[in-house]
Amino acid sequence: MKKHSIRLIALMFLACCLTSAVGQKRNKYEFERNLPVYADSLLKDLTYPLAWGHSPIKSFKKWKKVARQKVFDCMLAPPPAPLPKPYEVKVLCEEQREGYKARKLEIRLSRYYWVPAYVLIPDGKGPFPAVNALHDHGGHLFIGKEKMIRPLACEDSTVIKDADEWLAGYEGQFFGDYLARHGYVVFSADAPMWGERGQKEGAQRNKYDMIAGNMMMYGIDLSAYMTYDDLSGTEYLASMSEVDASRVACVGWSMGGYRAWMLSALSDRIKVGASVCWMVTTDEQMSFKYSRTENGGFANCFPG
């Protein structure tokens, strides 16, 4: 009798848990599959009045100035500039590689935080052209800059192993190291939530949207902070004595491709931008045909 009672209690507890997990339903509702039921109407109302070709501004130079300011307005408040001086840098370690030097840095891009980064500098006499290499999302937050540049020997063995495993999907080629061997200074920094800018509790992709929402409560935007850091990182790169500031480019794929086109649009430092495999449209991504199902959508979302 006692066994049956315990079993019955366990089954009732399981039933309650399943009910909570599935969620109670009402006959009427307003949201479906992570979207409001009127999502298609919202898409029809998006006319993009400031888009080039739609805008009444016909001078590209004037349009660029107005459109750029609109983007900055949507990005909300920037991180406060560092004090007492910009681009305070700590060199954490350095090593010689075949044809170039590799350094791990921490750069003071804001009064709030330091940003970990790698920089590769070709041997020989500069100044050299430079590339800001912007890492992807990939659903993998444990590494960031290490997706673009081979980790230095001073890194933890788990980081080196993880980067090598990630590289298997790219035919074993670290893109940044390839560029450095061909005469480019290469810079790559961790975006917020990636690599050494992640969570104390460990990389948890399913927490991304929650953290982004919490940051909005402070009047700031997580995706915008990523873009602000890319802008500041590019300014630091252009300020290096080894760099020809008139020949600075950026490149990235997936989320890095998004970062590349934002950086190209917002910085006059960038002379060439390459956005690789960044090809979704709002009409597809935010419709019932596709619908967002993964975490991390805030990585490319400004409030405006």
Segments (PLM) and residue ranges:
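N-terminal cap/lid segment of alpha/beta-hydrolase-fold proteins
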Residues: 73, 77-126, 130
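Bacterial Sec-dependent N-terminal signal peptides
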Residues: 1-27
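Cap/lid segment of the alpha/beta-hydrolase catalytic domain
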Residues: 126, 133-228, 239, 286-287
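Alpha/beta-hydrolase fold nucleophile elbow
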Residues: 242-254
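N-terminal pre-domain segments of enzymes
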Residues: 24-73, 77
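Glycine-rich nucleophile elbow surrounding the catalytic serine of serine-hydrolase chemistry
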Residues: 252-262
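Mobile cap/lid helix-loop segments that gate and shape the active-site cleft of serine hydrolases
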Residues: 210, 216-217, 232, 272-304
